[in-house]
């Protein structure tokens, strides 16, 4: 049976790992063992932070909606309840964008949500 030499595949593998570690600090960029660990950890961070990114944006949208709604005398929770009662099915991303860029349109949405609320609903102080 013929002898199998793996120098080419090993070199390609090392080149791929060191390419992924390009720009890292210290031995992480040029020592294969340390670079492999750094690249693996970077992948773990990337995977985790793709999930965290969704949470962060949702929190940002809620903060923006809450700020715009409080200026009109409602709280975020009461406003969202009013939207549900009014049958307005806009998601938080769209609501935050409207609140940021189209203030008059958002005031109209707030008015509809207020009108749909039952009498005596809590209003922001």
Swiss-Prot record:
Answer yes or no on keyword tRNA-binding.
Answer: no
Keywords assigned by UniProt, alphabetized: Ribonucleoprotein, Ribosomal protein, RNA-binding, rRNA-binding
Q: Name one GO cellular component term.
A: ribonucleoprotein complex
Q: Which SUPFAM superfamilies match?
A: Ribosomal protein L20
Q: Which Pfam families match?
A: Ribosomal_L20
Q: Please name the GO terms of the biological process aspect recorded for this protein, alphabetically.
A: ribosomal large subunit assembly; translation
- InterPro entries listed in its UniProt record: Ribosomal_bL20 (IPR005813), RIBOSOMAL_L20_CS (IPR049946), Ribosomal_protein_bL20_C (IPR035566)
Does the keyword Ribosomal protein feature in the UniProt annotation? yes
Q: Which domain of life is it from?
A: Bacteria
Question: What family does the database annotate?
Answer: Belongs to the bacterial ribosomal protein bL20 family.
**Its biological function?**
Binds directly to 23S ribosomal RNA and is necessary for the in vitro assembly process of the 50S ribosomal subunit. It is not involved in the protein synthesizing functions of that subunit.
In Swiss-Prot or TrEMBL terms, this protein is called Large ribosomal subunit protein bL20
């Amino acid at each position: 049976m013929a002898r199998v030499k793996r120098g080419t595949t090993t070199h390609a593998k090392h080149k791929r790992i060191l390419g992924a570690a390009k720009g890292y600090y210290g031995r992480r960029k040029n020592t294969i063992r340390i670079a492999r660990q750094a690249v693996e950890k970077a992948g773990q961070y990337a995977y985790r932070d793709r999930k965290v990114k969704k949470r962060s944006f949702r929190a940002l949208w809620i903060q923006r909606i809450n700020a715009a709604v409080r200026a009109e005398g409602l709280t975020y929770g009461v406003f969202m309840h009013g939207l549900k009662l009014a049958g307005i099915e806009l998601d938080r991303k769209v609501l935050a964008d409207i609140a940021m860029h189209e203030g008059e349109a958002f005031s109209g949405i707030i008015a509809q949500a207020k009108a749909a609320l039952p009498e005596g609903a809590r209003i922001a102080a």
